[in-house]
Amino acid sequence: MITIKIGGSVVDDLHPSTIADIKKIAESEGVILVHGGGKEVTKVCEQLGKEPKFVTSPSGIKSRYTDKETAEIFTMVMSGRINKTIVQMLQKNGINAIGLSGVDAKVIEADRKKKLLIVNEKGRKQAIDGGYTGKIREVNASFIKSLLDQGLTPVISPIAISEESEFLNVDGDRAAAYVAGKVGSDKVLFITNVDGLLMDDKVVPKLTLAEAKEIRPKIGPGMEKKILASTEALDMGVTTALIANGQKENPISSAISHDNCTVIEHE
């Protein structure tokens, strides 16, 4: 079984062979898709006159600050347009996909963060209200497995539900890692717009789990989250994490074959 995270930046730019590639893999093993879409959320926020706000953690991770209004827009865009567009593409190509958010059947439960520690404009650490951002606590693995058993391909948007039944924004890469770990996927694949982790403009072909943890603080914000998610997935029992480019031919099967991508394994 493989869990695939499709980054929002590549949803509209996937290689034409990608859907057929997903279909081929889905026929031989279960496929779970988790998607992003942050850029589309930002675009809709601006169209609605809501200025997007981003914050940076002391470790350098940049993330969206999600107040109540942003959480509503995030839910609308992620679980509406983006999720259903992906499901439509899959259905059009003979893949029996079902679109879900983490709210449906409590697929992803999270705890609302009370405080966020950020670095402010003056470069100082500051604690601010956590807004509607969540830390993933649980995944409804049995429900996801039941969909796979019926021959369905789940397509999950990273909106979680809190104990108080609030919509919470959770990071898509980490959502994919938790889904992969809890469901028991042997592989998690992060599809992005570069060939993997780049160091000195060259793809790093292989990392052990220990090496990935050691190297993570030295990596730029976008890829840093993917390395973090990869290590979390492996810590939860996933065998292999892959980071690959979705804009080349047959990106899924190429990554599974370890062709021109970054592979992270326990040893």
Swiss-Prot record:
What domain of life is recorded for the organism?
A: Archaea
Pathway stated in the Swiss-Prot or TrEMBL entry? Amino-acid biosynthesis; L-lysine biosynthesis via AAA pathway; L-lysine from L-alpha-aminoadipate (Thermus route): step 2/5; Amino-acid biosynthesis; L-arginine biosynthesis
According to UniProt, residues marked as the site described as Transition state stabilizer are: 5, 226
Any one biological process term the GO annotation gives: L-arginine biosynthetic process
> Catalysed reaction(s)?
[amino-group carrier protein]-C-terminal-N-(1,4-dicarboxybutan-1-yl)-L-glutamine + ATP = [amino-group carrier protein]-C-terminal-N-(1-carboxy-5-phosphooxy-5-oxopentan-1-yl)-L-glutamine + ADP; [amino-group carrier protein]-C-terminal-gamma-(L-glutamyl)-L-glutamate + ATP = [amino-group carrier protein]-C-terminal-gamma-(5-phospho-L-glutamyl)-L-glutamate + ADP
Q: Which InterPro entries would you find in this protein's record?
A: AceGlu_kinase-like_sf (IPR036393), AcgluKinase_fam (IPR004662), Asp/Glu/Uridylate_kinase (IPR001048), LysZ (IPR037529)
The cross-references to NCBIfam families, in alphabetical order and at most eight, read: argB (TIGR00761), PRK14058.1-1 (NF010659), PRK14058.1-4 (NF010662)
Which terms in the Gene Ontology molecular function aspect does this entry carry? Answer: acetylglutamate kinase activity; ATP binding; N2-acetyl-L-aminoadipate kinase activity
Which key words are in the record? Amino-acid biosynthesis, Arginine biosynthesis, ATP-binding, Cytoplasm, Kinase, Lysine biosynthesis, Nucleotide-binding, Transferase
Q: Where in the cell is it found?
A: Cytoplasm
GO CC, alphabetical: cytoplasm
User: Binding residues for substrate, per the UniProt record?
Assistant: 37-38, 64, 169
Species whose genome carries this gene: Nitrosopumilus maritimus (strain SCM1)
Q: Which family does it belong to?
A: Belongs to the acetylglutamate kinase family. LysZ subfamily.
Tell whether Ligase is among the UniProt keywords.
no
Function statement: Involved in both the arginine and lysine biosynthetic pathways. Phosphorylates the LysW-bound precursors glutamate (for arginine biosynthesis), respectively alpha-aminoadipate (for lysine biosynthesis).
Which leading EC class covers this enzyme?
transferase
Q: Primary place of residence?
A: cytoplasm
Name the record gives this protein = Putative [LysW]-aminoadipate/[LysW]-glutamate kinase
Q: Does the keyword 4Fe-4S apply?
A: no
What are its E.C. numbers?
Answer: 2.7.2.17, 2.7.2.19
